[in-house]
Amino acid sequence: MEELRCPEAKLAPPEVVIATEAPPPSLVDRYFTRWYKADVKGKPCEDHCILQHSNRICVITLAGSHPVLQSGKAIQRISYQISNNCSRLENKVSGKFKRGAQFLTELAPLCKIYCSDGEEYTISSCVRGRLMEVNENILHQPSLLQEKPSTEGYIAVVLPKFEESKSVTEGLLTQQQYEEVVVKRTNATATTP
């Protein structure tokens, strides 16, 4: 049996492929939908970000345009003591039905952030639901709030009522709508003398 040969056929040199793909989405971008509340309680630039998981859990964080995240701000301390009778640290949740969780409205304060320049910021819930947990790590390491606001520097975790889980996002902005608000705000301050 004669061996078949094809002398004209040559292997092409291997091609060098440069990866031009975008990096994979972060864990937060993969599993959470970002919602925003601009100018919370009518205070300009005090924007909050709500990360909503598919299981309806909401993680409350600061939006990138919040004054606390701007350069030059130094956080002096953070307090979950809302009033003399109310501390978010006393929230004790137990059981399948999350007994003992504090109920929050959209405007309920979660914590207060005190900056070294004397400014004080009250962070609100932005969603109705039960307070599952607060991030005690930011009490001891306030810099987490500025360094990793969407992950380790979150403020609190809120669980909306099941019946209200679809309506939670009413009144909140999508990522694109929020970016438009920030651009308009930037343009307005740039044109104002």
UniProtKB/Swiss-Prot annotation:
<dbReference type="GO" id="GO:0048813">
    <property type="term" value="P:dendrite morphogenesis"/>
</dbReference>
<keyword id="KW-0539">Nucleus</keyword>
<dbReference type="GO" id="GO:0030833">
    <property type="term" value="P:regulation of actin filament polymerization"/>
</dbReference>
<protein>
    <recommendedName>
        <fullName>Protein Abitram</fullName>
    </recommendedName>
</protein>
<dbReference type="GO" id="GO:0030425">
    <property type="term" value="C:dendrite"/>
</dbReference>
<dbReference type="GO" id="GO:0032433">
    <property type="term" value="C:filopodium tip"/>
</dbReference>
<keyword id="KW-0966">Cell projection</keyword>
<dbReference type="GO" id="GO:0003785">
    <property type="term" value="F:actin monomer binding"/>
</dbReference>
<comment type="function">
    <text>Actin-binding protein that regulates actin polymerization, filopodia dynamics and increases the branching of proximal dendrites of developing neurons.</text>
</comment>
<dbReference type="GO" id="GO:0030426">
    <property type="term" value="C:growth cone"/>
</dbReference>
<dbReference type="GO" id="GO:0051489">
    <property type="term" value="P:regulation of filopodium assembly"/>
</dbReference>
<dbReference type="GO" id="GO:0005634">
    <property type="term" value="C:nucleus"/>
</dbReference>
<dbReference type="InterPro" id="IPR033753">
    <property type="entry name" value="GCV_H/Fam206"/>
</dbReference>
<dbReference type="InterPro" id="IPR039169">
    <property type="entry name" value="Abitram"/>
</dbReference>
<dbReference type="Pfam" id="PF01597">
    <property type="entry name" value="GCV_H"/>
</dbReference>
<dbReference type="InterPro" id="IPR011053">
    <property type="entry name" value="Single_hybrid_motif"/>
</dbReference>
<dbReference type="GO" id="GO:0016607">
    <property type="term" value="C:nuclear speck"/>
</dbReference>
<dbReference type="GO" id="GO:0030027">
    <property type="term" value="C:lamellipodium"/>
</dbReference>
<comment type="subunit">
    <text>Interacts with F-actin. Interacts with G-actin.</text>
</comment>
<dbReference type="GO" id="GO:0051015">
    <property type="term" value="F:actin filament binding"/>
</dbReference>
<keyword id="KW-0009">Actin-binding</keyword>
<comment type="similarity">
    <text>Belongs to the ABITRAM family.</text>
</comment>
